[in-house]
């Protein structure tokens, strides 16, 4: 039977049909090879936008720097980064006038945070540029390496464990004439294998000491490493993103804390909230503009797009903003907040791996590292690459490019949002002093502008004024990519508004299905995604029920765990059938053990083990959840776990799901190939780090574990704790006298060894 597709929409309001326009099926594109070209593009573009600024030279590193601040006012519509300090400060002053006490209060909140934050805050985050090894590392390892180097160079303030004291060490490290670091290197040698009698290459990892003079150290401390951004949809070209080192991270964190505190108090800010809270905040602004425009005014909304937001921002300008916001605060606080923008004004961009050349005729491949680009003959490169290299050469020092203007992606999202909101704030009638006025929403570089005026000419004048005001602050609204509509229909941060925010369910499609973590987590995540979409994305009961059935089917095919009474033959069916036959209460078997599915849309919030617990055979319960069963993983399992969900568009979301530790919550083993590479030394460091932390937690169970305050080391804390516990256990008769004496002896030995060290 043929169905006329328009019939499907008869009962559906037009705006709900947005889910049918979904273009993003299939996998997103990933980048391969080197990111050097993209990074050079970023550096060259950023300098081009500020080309009429003033050139200076950094006295410490010798890096050439371009300063566009207070540069010539733009005469055309090309993007430019010539922010005017006085305009920026005035916008900030008006923002404060409209929100009395906002900066003052945020400073007080931030000061409290600054004094309480522990240095382990910096272990959050994925890849971090590790300046000691000159490449990316997991954040925790990079921090450990930095602290280790600091201590071996006599910088000890970090021992208190407070982030602010670690930052004191960072400041001091920059004054040192030289810094000694430990780096890893690789030795290769050919040896004969005893068993196969063949020659094999054996790699050994060594650690060696290396001295960096002040200039080399400063360059590393100011370096942002670059990578290619992966999985970006809807773009033909890839682009580079930056990851800063540990010296910069702490300072950025405090600046963003202050800016976040300000954003929370601004009704036009789309950060730091998300989800339904964000939608409510935005709907308020729209409602305000629409109620005020009913009779005499017309109202239009621009779905805005800015050209190269962060390449036109400037750290020097952020310094002015911070100086203004903190103007009545204590000196130490102002200093600590001004360091991040100062470091960014002197930043260096690491160019990545360099280029790979291969000769088809001679079957040769060779790597041209970024360090070699400064003086290699350009005849080997194609035209476009040659132009890039010629342009970037004057900026190169040791394989990094001096990049003073521009902010790099994602570094100061909150602070740049404050800047954007300060322009939206200027749209009030008391500032425009005319018949048009505006308001809007800002979330990092994304904005929506709502303009009200008596007639179309007024709307046009309002938009023009907004556009020019933006230019004065180094923000470039793209006339090509922004579009205007009657208020009531616009898009902001992938939320589509049409008389209210429309649920764009298709965005969530990629997160339906089996995640591939393990049987336990996948079941839990799968039903949680369906539950969340019923709550947040207008997923109706019938569709949810269908989604659930499809998910169970998908899950059974993935893990080959079809019901015990099915005819489908898989590798597991022999075991599953055997279990099915010897189980009395078949309803109690988990789906992953060939049991039936008991989920429906009413009980999605219950973990499967809990749902079926009462129905399980006793011996099955005992095998499934017995802590003594070697297959029950208790290593990583908390009662709540986090999964990272990737929607089709927009940022990855963190999603909590219930985790019940069973034989199905296995954790896959680390790939063995890492053990033969230069990463091996790092892996050993990481395991050592992990062991120490686990040991420490044995001594201090979570209930009694307070973060150590004062300067006692972990070892001292554990020894004194062991002594106290041993005495209590001995006096209450839980341990014998000889055990007690033994423990005391071990404690004394440990202390003795520490003294000798």
Swiss-Prot record:
Residues 50-82 are annotated as: Disordered. Coiled coil: none annotated. Its main location: host cell. It comes from Influenza A virus (strain A/Beijing/11/1956 H1N1). Influenza RNA polymerase is composed of three subunits: PB1, PB2 and PA. Interacts (via N-terminus) with PA (via C-terminus). Interacts (via C-terminus) with PB2 (via N-terminus); this interaction is essential for transcription initiation. Interacts (via C-terminus) with human PKP2 (via N-terminus); the interaction competitively inhibits the interaction between the RNA polymerase subunits PB1 and PB2. InterPro entries: RNA-dir_pol_NSvirus, RNA_pol_PB1_influenza. PROSITE patterns: RDRP_SSRNA_NEG_SEG. A motif (Nuclear localization signal) lies at residues 187-195, 203-216. RNA-dependent RNA polymerase which is responsible for replication and transcription of virus RNA segments. The transcription of viral mRNAs occurs by a unique mechanism called cap-snatching. 5' methylated caps of cellular mRNAs are cleaved after 10-13 nucleotides by PA. In turn, these short capped RNAs are used as primers by PB1 for transcription of viral mRNAs. During virus replication, PB1 initiates RNA synthesis and copy vRNA into complementary RNA (cRNA) which in turn serves as a template for the production of more vRNAs. Phosphorylated by host PRKCA. The lineage of its organism: Viruses, Riboviria, Orthornavirae, Negarnaviricota, Polyploviricotina. Residues 249-256 are annotated as: Promoter-binding site. This is RNA-directed RNA polymerase catalytic subunit. One of its GO terms (cellular component) is host cell nucleus.
